[in-house]
Amino acid sequence: MVLIRVLANLLILQLSYAQKSSELVIGGDECNINEHPFLVLVYYDDYQCGGTLLNEEWVLTAAHCNGKDMEIYLGVHSKKVPNKDVQRRVPKEKFFCDSSKTYTKWNKDIMLIRLDRPVRKSAHIAPLSLPSSPPSVGSVCRVMGWGTITSPQETYPDVPHCANINLLDYEVCRAAYAGLPATSRTLCAGILEGGKDSCVGDSGGPLICNGQFQGIVSWGGDPCAQPREPGVCTNVFDHLDWIKGIIAGNTDVTCPL
């Protein structure tokens, strides 16, 4: 009965979702159903985001995905025909880089969510490890999510789409977007010639480079996937001490400047 209620709620959310958000994968293909057991679907205030399961109690996503009445779904592939092992959770606690929950396009767009109860691992639910080494420019990266697959007109898929993009030099993003500082805790990821990118609805989801979880999708150009307008992601490696500290119960830990 509980599972039936969860699946019904997911279908209702799919039908009521207003197709508004901050980032979706352009130029990709349907993800393999078995390649994203760590990918979570976040609904809030009629918006949609992605996120990443770190362990049975914690999800990492973008700070700008914070909202009221958040619902977190795990084990999802098709939203219309859910897997039997889909699980629904809500936040027990949320943690931000500072108490004011402030962030900018180049700093602190990161949020840790402690779930209301532990997740049960299953065929379609498993955590993703934090990175063991820093990201390297030139890496091939995988981006994924249920975001729009067309831009500027928005077309939202039933299943997550995945695309391979490259980790670019930060100066490429500085040239594309006025106002970015000389240094930041972000990554620049995309295809120089355009055609592939995260987009509206993908925010908060993972950027996986050479097999390691290196970024959190944050923002990008509008329309998405334009030449020399890559996506910008929060650098996970730069925030490892904060992430590990919060999970360990040290709420006094601070984010890097």
UniProtKB/Swiss-Prot annotation:
Recorded GO CC terms: extracellular region; secretory granule
Alphabetical GO biological process terms: proteolysis; regulation of blood pressure
Top-tier EC class: hydrolase
Annotated thermal dependence: Heat-stable to about 95 degrees Celsius.
Pfam families, per the entry: Trypsin
Signal sequence extent: 1-18
Tissue expr: Expressed by the venom gland.
Documented EC number(s): 3.4.21.-
Keyword annotations from UniProtKB, A to Z: Disulfide bond, Fibrinogenolytic toxin, Hemostasis impairing toxin, Hydrolase, Hypotensive agent, Protease, Secreted, Serine protease, Signal, Toxin, Zymogen
MF-aspect GO terms: serine-type endopeptidase activity; toxin activity
Catalytic machinery residues: H64, D109, S203
InterPro entries, per database record: Peptidase_S1_PA, Peptidase_S1_PA_chymotrypsin, Peptidase_S1A, Trypsin_dom, TRYPSIN_HIS, TRYPSIN_SER
Major place of residence: secreted
Keyword Endoplasmic reticulum: no
Subcellular location: Secreted
Family as reported in the entry's similarity comment: Belongs to the peptidase S1 family. Snake venom subfamily.
Quaternary state and interactors: Monomer.
Leftover remarks: Negative results: does not have activity on gamma-chains of fibrinogen (FGG), and does not coagulate human plasma. Does not induce or inhibit platelet aggregation.
Name under which the protein is recorded: Beta-fibrinogenase mucrofibrase-1
Annotated organism of origin: Protobothrops mucrosquamatus
